[in-house]
UniProtKB/Swiss-Prot annotation:
Single GO MF descriptor: mRNA binding
Lineage: Bacteria, Pseudomonadati, Campylobacterota, Epsilonproteobacteria, Campylobacterales
Subunit structure: Homodimer. Part of the ribosomal stalk of the 50S ribosomal subunit. Forms a multimeric L10(L12)X complex, where L10 forms an elongated spine to which 2 to 4 L12 dimers bind in a sequential fashion. Binds GTP-bound translation factors.
Gene: rplL
GO cellular component terms, A-Z: cytosolic large ribosomal subunit
Family statement drawn from the similarity comment of this UniProt entry: Belongs to the bacterial ribosomal protein bL12 family.
Keywords: Ribonucleoprotein, Ribosomal protein
Family annotation (CDD domains): Ribosomal_L7_L12
Pfam families reported in the protein's UniProt record: Ribosomal_L12, Ribosomal_L12_N
The protein, known as: Large ribosomal subunit protein bL12
Function statement: Forms part of the ribosomal stalk which helps the ribosome interact with GTP-bound translation factors. Is thus essential for accurate translation.
Annotated GO biological process: translation
Gene3D superfamilies the UniProt entry points to: 3.30.1390.10, Single helix bin
InterPro entries to which the protein is assigned, alphabetical: Ribosomal_bL12 (IPR000206), Ribosomal_bL12_C (IPR013823), Ribosomal_bL12_C/ClpS-like (IPR014719), Ribosomal_bL12_oligo (IPR008932), Ribosomal_bL12_oligo_N_sf (IPR036235)
Amino acid sequence: MAITKEDVLEFISNLSVLELSELVKEFEEKFGVSAAPVMVAGAAVAGAAGGAAEEKTEFDIVLQDGGDKKINVIKVVRALTGLGLKEAKDAVEQTPSVLKEGVSKAEAEEAKKQLEEAGAKVELK
């Protein structure tokens, strides 16, 4: 029985955030491509003129170190991401790991605060 596009889409839709991130990295390595968005030339010219005054609106939450209180950090990671226990534990132990991508500044700062209170070291990119 051949695998259809719908089968692939259904499989991907059931992946966790961490598993999906790993899948994207494997695609990038295997096919020599980048998942970075392509910028249109016209937008680049317009963006260059006002780019210095613009404030960054989307952030990635990167866990740099789980700290000494890993259990507390795992609990916060699970609450923030919706990951299962094993995925959250792996994310905390295999640092640096991207917990969330493209979130608002307020959400990123709140997540950073919660993670740091639990004992983690976090970077917003």
